[in-house]
């Protein structure tokens, strides 16, 4: 009688833990904006405008939603200081290519595998207990 009580409790615990699935969802959409970068040197500051990639992450912990936004400036080639001699270049005119940015959407999700396997383990334990009775 005592062993069947333990097996019943194990089966109930396995079913209850199956309800605690963990799901993670990721949504991506590329977005750019212009940012102003201020650089200071020797008490003299200068501002430059640069395109930047905008990233936003939303994190929910214990029903508290926190949103993080970052702006990552995209690299641009700046002229290097110093002297240089350019090699002669011969070129032919190539057709102009134009590109336009389009938003990219992707969604992925993951459900915790351990939460799915635990009820099966509880059922196996309950079945083994029933065989031993």
UniProtKB/Swiss-Prot annotation:
Sequence repeat coordinates: 75-88, 91-103
Membrane association type: Lipid-anchor; GPI-anchor
Location(s) in or outside the cell: Secreted, Cell wall; Membrane
Glycan-linked positions: 21, 23-24, 26, 28, 31-33, 36, 38-39, 46, 48, 81, 97
Lipid attachment points (GPI-anchor amidated glycine): 112
Region (Disordered): 79-104
Gene Ontology annotations of biological process type: agglutination involved in conjugation with cellular fusion; conjugation with cellular fusion; fungal-type cell wall organization
InterPro entries reported in the protein's UniProt record: Flocculin_t3_rpt
Crosslinked positions (Glycyl lysine isopeptide (Lys-Gly) (interchain with G-Cter in ubiquitin)): 80
Segments of skewed composition (Polar residues): 81-104
Protein name as it appears in the record: Covalently-linked cell wall protein 12
Native species: Saccharomyces cerevisiae (strain ATCC 204508 / S288c) (Baker's yeast)
């Amino acid at each position: 009688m005592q062993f069947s009580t333990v097996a019943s409790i194990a089966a109930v615990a396995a079913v209850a833990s199956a309800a605690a699935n963990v799901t993670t969802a990721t949504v991506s959409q590329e977005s750019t904006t212009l940012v102003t970068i201020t650089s200071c040197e020797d008490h003299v500051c200068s501002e430059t405008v640069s395109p930047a990639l905008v990233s936003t992450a939303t994190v929910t912990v214990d029903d508290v939603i926190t949103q993080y936004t970052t702006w990552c400036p995209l690299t641009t080639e700046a002229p290097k200081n110093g002297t240089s001699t350019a090699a002669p270049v011969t070129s032919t005119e190539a057709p102009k290519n134009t590109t336009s940015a389009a938003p990219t959407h992707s969604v992925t999700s993951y459900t915790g595998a351990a939460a799915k396997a635990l009820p099966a383990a509880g059922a196996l334990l309950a079945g083994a207990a029933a065989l031993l009775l």
